[in-house]
Design a protein with these regions (language model features):
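A short, conserved, highly charged catalytic patch centered on acidic carboxylates
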Residues: 1-132, 137-151, 159-160
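Residue-identity detector for glutamine
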Residues: 6, 24, 31, 64, ...
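Alpha-helix initiation/capping motif
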Residues: 7-8, 176, 227
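Long, acidic, intrinsically disordered low-complexity segments
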Residues: 44-65, 162-200
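Non-catalytic nucleic-acid substrate-recognition regions in nucleic-acid-modifying enzymes
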Residues: 179-248
Length: 248
């Protein structure tokens, strides 16, 4: 019988948290509050399992660049060497199924997918439009040293929350105060081709349509006591909420 690989997530957490501490950054761990707006968004957004509760990134921080713009940083750790990111056939972070439903298995299993999920919570429920989602995994070499692997993704209103890989990094020193402005410039240089943008936009519109279909069915089943006009008004309110959240 093959020997199962043991998760080293606690070691990954120790390593990365030690980096953040050495950079003298004010980072917060899972259940620690960061910012009222961010904390509420993580609480209100659907969880990685699809239910109610709270979304808890392994680490989170809020950094400011030279233009006084704030960037939430959301970090997720996984303890297996093959659990950094799961992408679809278009090379996008695969957080939706073929039926345009949340891909909870990927969101739960892969570090970047989880971090991008958290970032979308902020896009939907806060005033922040530019978020950095970071996934970190790793493995031990034959001497017991941790060899980390890092995925850094830009999740923004400009890319409709899809997430774009920024670059390859071996640590998180780009978050240090003296390096952060250069990192922001690098992030801002990213763009989607018109074809990529249109494809993602169509996917987002399909997600909204699927959500509204489900909403309509739920209203019909759960609010049969309402008059037709009441049901229409309730549905319209949800349409506007969804459209606003998606930035259309």
């Amino acid at each position: 019988m093959a020997k199962s690989t043991q998760s080293i997530e606690p070691n990954i957490a120790d390593l990365v948290n030690s980096w953040l501490k050495s950079y003298q950054l004010d980072y917060k761990l899972e259940q620690e509050p960061l910012n009222d707006e961010i904390d509420k968004a993580l609480k209100d957004y659907f969880t990685k399992n699809g239910g109610a509760g709270a979304n808890r990134p392994d680490a989170k921080l809020l950094l400011q660049d030279k233009n006084l713009d704030y960037y939430p940083i959301l970090i997720e750790y996984k303890g297996y060497p093959d659990k950094l990111v799961k992408k679809d056939s278009e090379d996008n972070v695969e957080n939706r199924t073929a039926k345009n439903e949340p891909h909870f298995k990927n969101i739960n299993t892969f570090a970047v997918n989880g971090a991008v999920h958290y970032a979308n919570a902020l896009l939907h429920h806060t005033s922040f439009t530019d978020i950095i989602a970071i996934g970190v995994i790793g493995e031990k070499d034959n001497k017991g040293n941790i060899i980390p692997k890092i995925g850094v993704y830009y999740v923004a209103k400009a890319n409709l929350g899809a997430g774009q890989e920024v670059a390859q990094f071996t640590d998180l020193s780009f978050l240090k105060k003296e390096n952060f402005d250069a990192f922001v410039q690098q992030v801002k240089s990213l763009s989607l081709s018109p074809e990529e943008f249109e494809r993602i936009k169509q996917q987002r519109e399909q997600e909204i349509d699927a959500s509204l279909t489900k909403l309509n069915n739920d209203i019909y089943e759960n609010e049969k006591g309402l008059g037709e006009n009441d049901r229409v008004l309730q549905a319209q309110g949800s349409v506007f909420t969804n459209k606003y959240a998606e930035g259309y």
